[in-house]
From Swiss-Prot:
Native organism taxonomy: Eukaryota, Metazoa, Chordata, Craniata, Vertebrata
Function: Probable pathogen-recognition receptor. May mediate the endocytosis of pathogens which are subsequently degraded in lysosomal compartments. May recognize in a calcium-dependent manner high mannose N-linked oligosaccharides in a variety of pathogen antigens.
Name this polypeptide is given: CD209 antigen-like protein D
Keywords: Calcium, Disulfide bond, Endocytosis, Glycoprotein, Lectin, Mannose-binding, Membrane, Metal-binding, Receptor, Signal-anchor, Transmembrane, Transmembrane helix
Subcellular location as annotated: Membrane
Originating organism: Mus musculus
Record gene name: Cd209d
Predominant cellular place of this UniProt entry's protein: membrane
């Protein structure tokens, strides 16, 4: 084969549409130089062949570095144990508040205090009718069992006005009993107002009056308080 024929065989023909400028050098010139020096027909092929182990290692390093950065960012957003405990306490407090708001230990118009429900009347009746009204509500005219309860009821009644309690001596003068038949505890006699009970005018029923107790005619019309034990599980958390 002649030298001219061999030269034509080795010559690479590059289409005109591949001729473009890259950093001031024509694409065709670069392709020709690659073909002459390395026997590569195009720049794309050169790019593929340039993927040596060093390049792959560099790419792997960059990938791992990026992954580590993402992990660090995610870990930094996780709350510390102290913050988690604070969040837990706030959630428990919120739960308790929601529980209290949704769970009612007493029926509507009744007031809860120390495990019992109290109904404070808005109307006035005599002592006997007040006792009957409480029974119709499934309760009793209030029986006082503790000093805390006495303080609570006395303060509430003082703001409302004279109020009946479930205490009388109608069956035996000067011997006071509650509506359930139990006797008045001697420790509670200190709650009588000074000079009371005096039984003036056949006063056989007890009322909350001012800062203490007073005996009064059972026919008088007063407010009244009913009491019953709360049976709701809401009373305990």
């Amino acid at each position: 084969m002649s030298d001219s024929m061999e030269s034509k065989t080795q010559q690479v023909v590059i289409p005109e549409d591949e001729e473009c400028l890259m950093s001031g050098t024509r694409y065709s010139d670069i392709s020709s130089r690659l073909q002459t020096k390395f026997g590569i027909k195009s720049l794309a092929e050169y790019t593929k062949q340039s993927r040596n182990p060093l390049v792959l290692q560099l790419l792997s390093f960059l990938f791992l570095a990026g992954l580590l950065l993402i992990i660090l960012i995610l870990v930094s957003k996780v709350p510390s144990s102290e913050v988690q405990n604070k969040i837990y306490q706030e959630l428990m407090q919120l739960k308790a508040e929601v529980h209290d708001g949704l769970c009612q230990p007493c029926a509507r118009d009744w007031t809860f205090f120390n495990g019992s429900c109290y109904f404070f009347s808005k109307s006035q009746r005599n002592w006997h009718n007040s006792t009957t009204a409480c029974q119709e509500l499934g309760a009793q005219l209030v029986i006082i069992e503790t000093d805390e309860e006495q303080t609570f009821l006395q303060q509430t009644s003082k703001a409302r006005g004279p109020t009946w309690m479930g205490l009388s001596d109608m069956h035996n003068e000067a011997t006071w009993h509650w509506v359930d038949g139990s006797p008045l505890s001697p420790s509670f006699t200190r709650y009588w107002n000074r000079g009371e009970p005096n039984n003036v005018g056949d006063e056989d029923c007890a009322e909350f009056s001012g800062d203490g107790w007073n005996d009064l005619s059972c026919d008088k019309l007063l407010f009244w308080i009913c009491k019953k034990v709360s049976t709701s599980s809401c009373t305990t958390k």
